[in-house]
C-alpha cells in the first residue's frame, strides 16, 4: 500500500491537533493540550486503490523550533495552518512557516489552511479582535496569500463543525499525488 506523508505546521493553538483528531476520529477534542509531536494514520481509497495517509502533527511553539524539522524528511505535502481569527498566526505563515518548510523541503508542495472558520462570525471573537482594531482573515486574503507564497491552494475548515474538513485532506492527497512539476519527485530530502 502506498503511503502519503502529510505534515501539519503552524502557530500553537491554531487548531492543528483538533483538525487531525476531528478528521481521523470524527470527534472534537474538548481540551487544549499543546503537542510535542504526534502522528495519525488513515486508509483512504483513491481511484479504487488503498493509500495510507500518514498525518504528522507538530508543535507550533518556539521551544520546538529545533525539534520540529526532524519530522520533515520524506514529506509528500505540508498543511500550513493559521486561524482565521488570529491575524498574528496569519502573519506567521509568511514570516515563519513557509520559510521554514521551504528551507528544509524546497520542492515539497504545501496547502495554506485557514482553521476555526466557525469562530469567524462569533460575537465574542469579533469583539476581542475589534478591541485590537483587527478583523477575521477573509477567504480572499487567504487566497491572495496562497498565490503569493506559491501554495498549491488555499482551503479553510472548521474542525468543530467539520465544514470543509474532508476537503482539506482530499486536496492534500491530490497535491501529493499530482505535484505541479511532474518532472521532479518532490519528496522532502535532507542533504
Swiss-Prot record:
Binding site for GTP: 10-17, 57-61, 115-118
Cleavable signal peptide: none
Cellular compartments annotated: Cell junction, Adherens junction; Cell membrane
Cellular component per GO, a single term: plasma membrane
Main location: other
Residue ranges the record assigns to the propeptide: 189-191
InterPro entries: Cdc42, P-loop_NTPase, Small_GTP-bd, Small_GTPase, Small_GTPase_Rho
Keyword GTP-binding: yes
Tissue specificity note: Highly expressed in the adult unfed gut, expression drops after feeding.
Membrane topology value: Lipid-anchor
Covalently lipidated residues, kind S-geranylgeranyl cysteine: 188
Molecular-function annotations in GO: GTP binding; GTPase activity; protein kinase binding
SMART domains (UniProt xref): RAB, RAS, RHO
Residue(s) carrying Cysteine methyl ester: 188
Motif (Effector region): 32-40
Keywords linked to the UniProt accession: Cell junction, Cell membrane, Developmental protein, GTP-binding, Lipoprotein, Membrane, Methylation, Nucleotide-binding, Prenylation
Source taxon at top rank: Eukaryota
SUPFAM superfamilies assigned: P-loop containing nucleoside triphosphate hydrolases
GO biological process: one example: small GTPase-mediated signal transduction
Pfam families, per database record: Ras
Function: Regulates mbt kinase activity and is also required to recruit mbt to adherens junctions. Together with mbt, regulates photoreceptor cell morphogenesis.
Annotated family: Belongs to the small GTPase superfamily. Rho family. CDC42 subfamily.
This protein's name: Cdc42 homolog
Species of origin: Anopheles gambiae (African malaria mosquito)
Amino acid at each position: 500500500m502506498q503511503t502519503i506523508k502529510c505534515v501539519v505546521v503552524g502557530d500553537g493553538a491554531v487548531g492543528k491537533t483538533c483538525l487531525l483528531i476531528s478528521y481521523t476520529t470524527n470527534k472534537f477534542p474538548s481540551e487544549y493540550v499543546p503537542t510535542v509531536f504526534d502522528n495519525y494514520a488513515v486508509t483512504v481509497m483513491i481511484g479504487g486503490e488503498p493509500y495510507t495517509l500518514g498525518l504528522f502533527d507538530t508543535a507550533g511553539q518556539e521551544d520546538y523550533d529545533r525539534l520540529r524539522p526532524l519530522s520533515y524528511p520524506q514529506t509528500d505535502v505540508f498543511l500550513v495552518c493559521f486561524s482565521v481569527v488570529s491575524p498574528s498566526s496569519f502573519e506567521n505563515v509568511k514570516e515563519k512557516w513557509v520559510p521554514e518548510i521551504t528551507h528544509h523541503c524546497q520542492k515539497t508542495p504545501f496547502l495554506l489552511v485557514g482553521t476555526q472558520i466557525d469562530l469567524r462570525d462569533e460575537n465574542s471573537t469579533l469583539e476581542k479582535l475589534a478591541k485590537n482594531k483587527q478583523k477575521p482573515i477573509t477567504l480572499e486574503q487567504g487566497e491572495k496569500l496562497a498565490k503569493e507564497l506559491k501554495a498549491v491552494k488555499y482551503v479553510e475548515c472548521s474542525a468543530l463543525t467539520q465544514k470543509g474538513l474532508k476537503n482539506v485532506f482530499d486536496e492534500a492527497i491530490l497535491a501529493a499525488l499530482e505535484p505541479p512539476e511532474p518532472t521532479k519527485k518532490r519528496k522532502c530530502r535532507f542533504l
